[in-house]
């Protein structure tokens, strides 16, 4: 029995290292420390009964915290009542946490395995031109007016651009662009 206790007693360097880890955990997550404290008393009994097992770093940290809690004297009845109330809360808290985990797990399964993935697009509305049609319409309109500015109104080379933009562009657009050209507010690169 003495050999088992000596084997589980950490060396000074291990204790120092574990105290650093415990301090870092408590400073990083003060909410979790409150939850861990009630569990320490229940795990202390398990550690004492099962001293033959090897301890992982987490269990070693728990044993260090247990040693500190056992060495702290309880001077008043209020202090002894507080851990008892904490144990009651600890028993209720894991049950509530398990229920939440079960609900979350069922939601995750439902999200991961959908029956079918349906891609739906809006039906084609021929009142509105497609993106490519819009781009080509604007480009041909600009090319036509560049050609007319360079070669004159009667140039036969410019007729093909006129046919292209008149077939692609809605007449409202052409009327608006013509007004903008006259006003000097046309957004395109015209000469």
UniProtKB/Swiss-Prot annotation:
Tissue: Expressed in the whole plant.
Subcellular compartments: Mitochondrion
Positions carrying N-acetylalanine: 2
GO cellular component terms attached to this protein's record: chloroplast thylakoid membrane; mitochondrion; nucleus; respiratory chain complex IV; thylakoid
Stored Pfam families: COX6B
Keyword Mitochondrion: yes
Domain CHCH per the UniProt entry, residue ranges: 134-177
Disulfide bridges in this chain: 137-169, 147-158
Skewed-composition ranges (Acidic residues): 99-114
Amino acid composition bias (Basic and acidic residues), ranges on this chain: 16-37, 45-56
Polar residues: compositionally biased ranges: 1-14
Keyword list, A-Z: Acetylation, Disulfide bond, Mitochondrion
GO molecular function, one term: copper ion binding
Intervals of motif Cx9C motif: 137-147
Region of interest called Disordered, as start-end residue ranges on this chain: 1-126
UniProt similarity note: Belongs to the cytochrome c oxidase subunit 6B (TC 3.D.4.8) family.
Name under which the protein is recorded: Cytochrome c oxidase subunit 6b-1
